[in-house]
Amino acid sequence: MAQVPAKAWKNYIARLRRLNNTAALKMESFLVHNDTSTDAGLKAALDYAYALSTTYGEGAAALSCEMYDAMAMLSGVNVPPAVPAPTADYGEVAQTVQGIMKWSKLPQSIGAGVGRLVKQAGVDTTMQNALRDGAEWAWVPQGDTCAFCIMLASNGWQKASKKALKNGHAEHIHSNCDCTYAVRFNEKTTVAGYDPEKYKAEYDDAEGGNWREKLNSLRRELGED
């Protein structure tokens, strides 16, 4: 079976993480040193958040294109080069930042929101190209994994479907998470270390009669509640 080596996958994840974290930290620093209580101050913060999400989102999308094309080559298929997904537009950025500000003015919380927008551009790139080419995808955990990511990973490899999207974006993007989608074009290709059967066993063994009950059980086991 052809595999993306674990070292190569971890390096890919680390590069994505640096982009997410750099954008988040720069946003935090801006908020620490600038007053956003005025209309002008808020506008400046939104402008900066948009600039960060665009610059670093483009980087995340480019990295995702590289990995997508590498998986296609590994699978031995001939598909068009991956196309970067659009980064968040100004309205999406403003909605994210102001939405967070309604419940938290902490720079860390708002910075994390900007980091999520950067990650979103990378994940959207993978998903949109997979839909274009009829590839399969799987949610591959990395590092400390939350209950929801375990549940997603338990699905294993699945045919790319718009059902996984909400308003054109991946539904499950959250802070402090290195998990992301991998793609493949045949059953002979995978990511080294990804074991969907292990995650399926964890999910199946969780108490509950439906997915919500099982998810809550996993959260209790992981100390998330």
Cite the ranges covered by each PLM segment.
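Domain-core detector
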Residues: 1-174, 183-225
